[in-house]
C-alpha cells in the first residue's frame, strides 16, 4: 500500500524474471496508494530480494497517479481492498486491475490477498516473498 515492501518486491522480481527470459518489451514499475514521500524500501524486503538474486537497492516509494493508472496495460494489486479502492478512484481502469495472487497456480478467492509483512517477523517477509514469486510465474504467462 505504501510501495516499500510488497509492490517493491513484486516489481523487482518481475523485472528480474522478465530479464532472464529476454522480455525487454515489458515496462514494469510500482507505486503505492499512500504517499510515503520518497521513503526508501524496507531493508528486510531489500535484503530478501538480494538474497534471492534480485536487485534490492535504489528504491524510493512513489504514489500512484491518475496518469500512471491511465497509461498502464495492467494494474496488479496485493489485496482485494486495494482492488476496490483502485476501482473507486480510477473506474476507467477497472478492467485492468487484478490481484497478483490470482495468477498463482494455487489461487483460491478466499485467500487471494498477499498479506503485508511490514514490521512483522522474518517468517512473514519470507512468506510474502514466496507468494509474490510464485504468483509472478503465472503473471508472466499472461503478459
Per-segment meaning from a language model:
Residues 1-72, 141-143:
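Conserved active-site segments centered on acidic
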Residues 8, 79-80:
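Short secondary-structure boundary segments
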Amino acid at each position: 500500500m505504501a510501495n516499500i515492501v510488497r509492490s517493491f518486491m513484486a516489481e523487482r522480481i518481475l523485472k528480474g524474471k522478465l530479464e532472464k527470459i529476454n522480455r525487454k518489451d515489458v515496462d514494469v514499475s510500482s507505486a503505492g496508494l499512500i504517499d510515503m514521500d520518497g521513503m526508501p524500501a524496507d531493508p528486510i524486503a531489500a535484503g530478501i530480494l538480494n538474497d534471492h538474486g534480485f536487485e534490492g537497492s535504489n528504491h524510493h516509494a512513489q504514489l500512484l497517479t491518475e496518469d500512471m493508472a491511465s497509461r498502464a496495460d495492467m494494474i496488479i494489486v496485493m489485496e482485494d481492498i486495494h482492488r476496490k479502492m483502485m476501482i473507486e478512484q480510477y473506474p476507467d481502469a477497472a478492467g485492468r486491475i487484478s490481484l497478483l495472487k490470482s495468477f498463482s497456480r494455487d489461487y483460491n478467492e478466499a485467500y487471494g490477498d498477499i498479506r503485508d509483512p511490514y514490521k512483522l517477523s522474518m517468517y512473514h517477509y519470507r512468506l510474502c516473498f514466496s507468494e509474490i514469486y510464485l504468483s509472478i510465474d503465472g503473471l508472466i504467462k499472461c503478459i
